[in-house]
Regions:
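Non-catalytic substrate-recognition and accessory regions of acyl/acetyltransferase enzymes
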Residues: 1-136, 143-169
Length: 170
């Protein structure tokens, strides 16, 4: 079976990860916006608003890349959730880290003598959201986070790196 480059079959059975930018290229912006309009996350309106309104523009500008997660529901692929990744620079003051932690950070970071801090680049999981418009839920939060982490591992296999950054709310 020949697959489009925009779609990767994931190791976790039943999920397909689709890069939003490639989806827009394939089916067009209007059809993509229609698809995204079916996403609902009443627990966090920012997560819903980002996907519906900002994700395509962020993708075009290269600020963040969004990955849509689809699962089979009643015989068709349905949007189960998404995650967005961006590149983040993390600054760690040298007086905060000691001993072995300092040695570990020193292997992966650049030390800024003037600022007396370490700077390291890490992928940021900037957005993570489940689609509550579909009952029952097609993906758990743990599965969604695992998919995002697998994607980061794949990226770091090519680019290097050992850290990831997650912004979250309880």
């Amino acid at each position: 079976e020949k697959r489009s480059r925009r779609c990767l079959e994931n190791r976790m059975t039943g999920f397909k990860i689709v890069n939003l930018k490639l989806l827009v290229e394939e089916i067009g912006e209007e059809e993509t916006k229609t698809l995204l309009s079916n996403f609902s996350c009443p627990l966090n309106e920012d997560v819903e608003e980002f996907l519906r309104i900002k994700a395509i523009e962020f993708s075009k500008q290269g600020l963040a890349q969004t990955h849509l997660i689809f699962a089979s529901y009643r015989g068709k692929l349905t949007l189960a959730g998404y995650f967005s990744l961006a590149n983040k620079y993390i600054t760690v003051k040298s007086n905060i880290v000691k001993g072995k932690l300092r040695q570990r950070i020193n292997r992966f970071a650049v030390f800024d003598q003037q600022a007396k801090s370490y700077c390291l680049s890490a992928p940021l999981i900037a957005q993570l959201g489940k689609n509550f418009a579909v009952k029952p839920s097609l993906i758990s939060g743990d599965e969604l986070l695992e998919l995002a982490c697998e994607k980061i591992s794949t990226i770091q296999l090519d680019l290097g790196g050992k850290f990831a950054y997650l912004e979250c709310e309880d």
